[in-house]
Amino acid sequence: MAYIKIALLAAIAALASAQTQEEIDELNVILNDVKSNLQEYISLAEDSSSGFSLSSLPSGVLDIGLALASATDDSYTTLYSEVDFAAVSKMLTMVPWYSSRLLPELESLLGTSTTAASSTEASSAATSSAVASSSETTSSAVASSSEATSSAVASSSEASSSAATSSAVASSSEATSSTVASSTKAASSTKASSSAVSSAVASSTKASAISQISDGQVQATSTVSEQTENGAAKAVIGMGAGVMAAAAMLL
């Protein structure tokens, strides 16, 4: 857990001081090893044949070691800019426990840092992807809503237009039907009037004709009767004259 925390802090420090992650990890490995095995480092420094001394520590390392021993936050990382990282890499290989202790810790820390970096990148990528997906989903929902609204408005407009057209056609049909009915009624009334007039005229004409015929017949009958009566009288008179003539001849 301590290495993970150091790795994360080191990553922050690397970004702040423009150092590579490997250089930060090497510094953290040596600082933690000195802190955990201080007596061994003191003994090594006292051995003149080791070529190692506390005074030969890379610049800035001792200051960071002291700050790290009492650190309660990551403020000690501000001292990283004062460290000679090239000298730190050289010092790691000078101590006799480099291969047995420092290198495994460094490899572990580098692996953790790589994992943490990968995790951070993956998290950032996932977040970006989620944001992009959310934006696309939102855009798609807004587009669908706009299309649905446009479709609803269009349908409503079409329905209104259709209803208005149907109403207008119905009104026009009703008006036409009413006009036709009125015209038909007027025509029927005119026809009835014409028929009544024609019938009345015909009846009047017929009555007049019949009257004239009747008058004619009466006149004719009267004339015939008069002529018959006159003829009969004349015949009687004639016959009387004849008889009287015959009687005279006989006498």
From Swiss-Prot:
Q: Cite a GO CC annotation.
A: fungal-type cell wall
Q: Does the keyword Cell wall biogenesis/degradation apply?
A: no
GO biological processes: cellular response to freezing; fungal-type cell wall organization
Q: Which InterPro entries match?
A: SRP1_TIP1, Yeast_PIR_rpt, Yeast_SRP1/TIP1_CWP
- Membrane topology summary: Lipid-anchor; GPI-anchor
The feature of type site (Covalent attachment to cell wall glycan) is located at Q217
Q: Which PANTHER family match?
A: CELL WALL PROTEIN CWP1-RELATED, SERIPAUPERIN
- The protein's name in its UniProt record: Cold shock-induced protein TIR2
The protein's organism comes out as Saccharomyces cerevisiae (strain ATCC 204508 / S288c) (Baker's yeast)
List the gene name: TIR2
